[in-house]
């Protein structure tokens, strides 16, 4: 298992609010919690930035982290990420903040310590472009945006 440096910025993390952990042996994501002093009510269409009380430094350019929505919040309540996916570069060292967006029809209250998103570590390949005049033909070619049909 890869070790990642984490800094607790809010003393409630690890005490009142659990540290991020994998829920099961097969879990890909670690839950991130809203490190709030009081509940926040999100009106329909509203976005806000929520602190997690944590900072990470991945420190390995072959890794990054992505912040993803929690499926239950999105499906049941319309609460998704304001930027859809958050990307944490390996050299970032600041607090993890989560942009949440209420795309639902009802106000939604986020409580202090509530699980609001999940973080997944992913491998990174930094590409070097090779300038060419043409590509070698492929079966797909330039077809895109539904060219292969729906069935």
UniProtKB/Swiss-Prot annotation:
User: Keyword Ligase on this protein?
Assistant: no
**Pathway, per record:** Pyrimidine metabolism; dUMP biosynthesis; dUMP from dCTP (dUTP route): step 2/2
Q: What class of enzyme is it?
A: hydrolase
Question: Which SUPFAM superfamilies did the record assign?
Answer: dUTPase-like (SSF51283)
Which reaction is recorded as catalysed by this protein?
A: dUTP + H2O = dUMP + diphosphate + H(+)
Q: Which PANTHER family match?
A: DEOXYURIDINE 5'-TRIPHOSPHATE NUCLEOTIDOHYDROLASE
> HAMAP family of this UniProt entry?
dUTPase_bact
Q: Write the protein's name.
A: Deoxyuridine 5'-triphosphate nucleotidohydrolase
């Amino acid at each position: 298992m890869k070790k990642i440096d984490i800094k607790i910025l809010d003393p409630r993390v690890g005490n009142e609010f659990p540290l991020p952990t994998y829920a099961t042996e097969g879990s890909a994501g670690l839950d991130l919690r809203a490190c709030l002093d009081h509940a926040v009510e999100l009106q329909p269409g509203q976005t806000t930035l929520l602190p997690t009380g944590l900072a990470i430094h991945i420190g390995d350019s072959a890794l990054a982290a992505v912040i993803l929505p929690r499926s239950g919040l999105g499906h049941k309540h319309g609460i998704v990420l304001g930027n859809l996916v958050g990307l944490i570069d390996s050299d970032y060292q600041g607090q993890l903040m989560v942009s949440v967006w209420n795309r639902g029809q009802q106000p939604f209250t986020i409580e202090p310590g509530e699980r609001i998103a999940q973080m997944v570590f992913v491998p990174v390949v930094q590409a070097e472009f090779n300038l060419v005049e043409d590509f070698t033909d492929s079966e797909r070619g330039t077809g895109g945006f539904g060219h292969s049909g729906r069935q």
